Structures are given as structure tokens and as C-alpha cells.
């Protein structure tokens, strides 16, 4: 799961500077940088604040963060076929 990278991609797509997202989320810019670079894993309450500040539902952030390694073997084929299409549709939402 690439949660930090997903947060960074959404932030950049929405053209929100890192310092603004950090401020709106109630965390420091340094901590947000660590999250975005997958050096730290935020707790659920921090994720909720980041999600709110990004105006993006938390389940959507989790979904976009999934990689094939996160999916059970029995479901990898369908995930690999559906995931790119769903991500493309979702990117239009963001």
C-alpha cells in the first residue's frame, strides 16, 4: 500500500501546497512530508483530517493506495484488469 504517495498525488492534482495541507490537517509540514514519502504511517484520526482537507473520501484514498501485492492471490487477476480503469475514472473526480 502506497498511502503516502497517494496523498501526495491527490494534493498535487488539487494544487494544494504541502504547507497548506499540513495546516488544514493540523499537522506540521515536516510530518506531512514524512507521510508523503512513506517514512511515517499516520494514525486514523490524522488520515481523516488529511482526507477532509483534500476533500477526498478516506475509502477512496485507501483504494487508490492499493497495489497488486495488497490483494489476495485469488483476486489479483481481476484487480489487475479493473484497477487501471477504475483509477482513470476516479482521477476525473479528483
Where does each model-flagged region fall?
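Hydrophobic micro-packing sites on short alpha-helices
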Residues: 46-54, 60-62
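Recognition helix of helix-turn-helix/homeodomain-like DNA-binding domains
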Residues: 26-41
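Short basic helix-loop element that most often maps to the first helix and adjoining turn
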Residues: 5-24, 76, 83-84
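Helix-turn-helix/winged-helix DNA-binding modules
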Residues: 13, 39-42, 53
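Conserved hydrophobic/aromatic packing and binding residues within compact polymer-binding modules
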Residues: 7, 21-22, 32-35, 61
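Short, charged recognition helix plus adjacent turn
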Residues: 62-94
Amino acid at each position: 500500500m502506497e498511502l503516502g504517495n497517494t496523498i501526495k498525488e491527490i494534493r498535487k492534482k488539487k494544487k494544494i501546497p504541502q504547507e497548506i495541507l499540513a495546516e488544514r490537517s493540523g499537522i506540521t509540514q515536516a510530518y506531512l512530508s514524512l507521510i508523503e514519502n512513506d517514512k511515517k504511517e499516520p494514525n486514523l484520526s490524522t488520515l481523516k483530517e488529511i482526507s477532509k482537507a483534500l476533500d477526498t473520501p478516506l475509502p477512496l484514498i485507501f483504494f487508490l493506495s492499493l497495489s497488486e501485492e495488497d490483494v489476495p492471490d485469488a483476486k489479483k487477476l481481476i484487480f489487475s484488469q479493473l484497477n487501471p480503469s477504475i483509477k482513470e475514472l476516479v482521477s476525473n473526480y479528483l
